[in-house]
Amino acid sequence: VTPSTLWQSGYEYALDAAQRTVLFWDALRQRGNNFVEHERQGLPPVLRFDYEIVMDGRSFKRPVNYALLRIVPPKGVTVDAKRRPYVIIDPRGGHGPGIGGFKDDSQVGVALREGHPVYFVIFFPNPEPGQTLLDVCEAEREFVHRVRELHPDAPKPGIVGNCQAGWAAMMLAAANPDDTGPVVIVGAPMSYWGGAWRE
């Protein structure tokens, strides 16, 4: 190692560190701008697909901050109302609701391409006053019941629960076996013996 190569290496290291620092802070700036813009828009779901609100839990007798959406199939995709509908329950986390359908190759996209009607349970940012977990379970039961009404000639809906929504899907299926079809829980480790009712 000569003094000139040492200086050259030091210069390259300093230049690289400075460039990476600028890129790091620029990434944070872009992330912050995206967050502010999303909040300015009213925190809509990050779904890639168009949708229609079927039921809004904020209008229920026991209001909850959840809603049932019907995913509108994109151009070129045809769904069969007699095929098993899918109800995808989104997890409460991340940048907002919609992670299960934020790109074409997602749970929503795959089910649509196979010709299944797809429904999506989203959440609004703030819970309703006095809302309980049991209220949410009841709302989800009403959502699934409504999907069954919309597809009377189809098999029972498949329920997909992502992360903590996997637990909601399991509670829903356990309490309402006559309304639910197969249940898929994604990233939701289950402990069948842990916890207590009031904890």
Q: Model-derived features: where do they sit?
A:
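N-terminal cap/leader regions of alpha/beta-hydrolase-fold enzymes
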Residues: 1-199
